[in-house]
Swiss-Prot record:
It is an enzyme of class 7 (translocase). This is Na(+)-translocating NADH-quinone reductase subunit D. Belongs to the NqrDE/RnfAE family. It comes from Neisseria meningitidis serogroup B (strain ATCC BAA-335 / MC58). One of its GO terms (molecular function) is oxidoreductase activity, acting on NAD(P)H, quinone or similar compound as acceptor. It is found in: Cell inner membrane. GO terms for biological process: sodium ion transport. NQR complex catalyzes the reduction of ubiquinone-1 to ubiquinol by two successive reactions, coupled with the transport of Na(+) ions from the cytoplasm to the periplasm. NqrA to NqrE are probably involved in the second step, the conversion of ubisemiquinone to ubiquinol. The chain crosses the membrane at residues 42-62, 72-92, 103-123, 131-151, 178-198. The gene is nqrD. Its main location: membrane.
Amino acid sequence: MADMKRLKHLMFSPFIDNNPIALQVLGICSALAVTTKLQTAIVMGISVALVTGFSSFFISLVRNYIPNSIRIIVQMAIIASLVTLVDQLLQAFAYELSKQLSVFVGLIITNCIVMGRAEAFAMKEPPLESLIDGIGNGAGYGIMLLVVATVRELIGSGKLLGYTVFQTVQDGGWYQTNGLFLLAPSAFFIIGFLIWGLRTWKPEQAEE
């Protein structure tokens, strides 16, 4: 039976202590693309968490039967199958969101977080631990997306999840929107400030 303390560590350490974006600087490309709106960031975060968790689980199940020479191909086949399933489900039940996310759901297969957990963890550890580790890392990625998307949508349009938070000047209110935050470069700066803030709060995360 898996140790509960270890499972909790695997699940929650990627949230702050070992965040895949803030500490490992992985998955940056999609973080720039899907964080203009909080809704797309939520869906992308959930998608990555599920794909990372279940791909790690299935890879761990068959890890002892995969020849070393083709392990990357097998990992990518499993990940691609799950990504295709997620993409089809989004198209079936959330078509508008699927169109907004465009190719970025399909590109989860190339996300370094998914491949990294499969290669570094799932190939060495039991299925349950691999599942928890994958979901934890996907959730850590999703948390960063949520923070970035909240800042970008709120400052860029005065809205969150499509609901008005700050009444804009155009609608007779006081808030002047800042279109810069709806452009990709703003995500770089926000992520940079988040990394700086985390490493100031936790100096042990700073690189030597």
